[in-house]
Amino acid sequence: MIFIFISLFAKIFFNYNDFFTNSHVKIMAKSLLNYQFHQVKQTINTPVLIFIHGLFGDMDNLGVIARAFSEHYSILRIDLRNHGHSFHSEKMNYQLMAEDVIAVIRHLNLSKVILIGHSMGGKTAMKITALCPELVEKLIVIDMSPMPYEGFGHKDVFNGLFAVKNAKPENRQQAKPILKQEINDEDVVQFMLKSFDVNSADCFRFNLTALFNNYANIMDWEKVRVFTPTLFIKGGNSSYIKIENSEKILEQFPNATAFTINGSGHWVHAEKPDFVIRAIKRFLNKN
């Protein structure tokens, strides 16, 4: 199966078992996202690395990966709308999320960026690149395909989150057993608890109601055509990037390469950060 994936991508599929203005694009974002910008001395041609988190997350989720590059690159980390400390909105789709990030890029007068996005953040990064390809030098997508996903894959998660909202616990310790009644995965429970906020009406920093109401938009995808050099990093045990979809991926991203990390799932950046860092470094060093 690996060799089939290689041939379809027509480039090397690495397999390790060891070891961020198109004049015609009108940006409608009215509020700036919450962001942290770590700037280092660099030449004018060195792009800024922008890290974009996934669903239910925040800017800290890719922090370990970002820190590995902070000595030689300026780093921009953001909270997407309805996440972290960014603004809440009833509307949410990839056009809007991409425009939000582009607004921050323009606010900071960045001329060249490298986008690194995980899951929903990966789709946002792909949409940004499609809207403003002249801004993006390279694109790195962690465990996400440019494909629509069918069904309601986070039903247990939403059930647990709404159960917490209805129960109004006073702290994480009280919220945990409520979540565990619906969510069997301890890692997912701990991930959700990171965003617990007793002062929020939803009991979480993310906008639970908006995420639920816009879930179909988050799972959806409109085809693009992007020639930017792109790296897809796949968790070996994850089904978000499927070998049988490689031709459809290449139709949208003809300059894509792929890298799989065995023994890891959808949160590959948290499970095997050293491998993800190594894959990104190798991709960034390619001319």
Swiss-Prot record:
Keyword Hydrolase: yes
InterPro entries: AB_hydrolase_1, AB_hydrolase_fold
Enzyme class name: hydrolase
GO molecular function: carboxylic ester hydrolase activity
Active site: 119, 266
Domain AB hydrolase-1: 47-273
EC number annotated for this UniProt entry: 3.1.-.-
Keyword terms, alphabetized: Hydrolase, Serine esterase
Entry keyword Nucleotide-binding: no
Family: Belongs to the DmpD/TodF/XylF esterase family.
Name of the protein in its database record: Putative esterase/lipase HI_0193
Organism: Haemophilus influenzae (strain ATCC 51907 / DSM 11121 / KW20 / Rd)
High-level lineage: Bacteria, Pseudomonadati, Pseudomonadota, Gammaproteobacteria, Pasteurellales
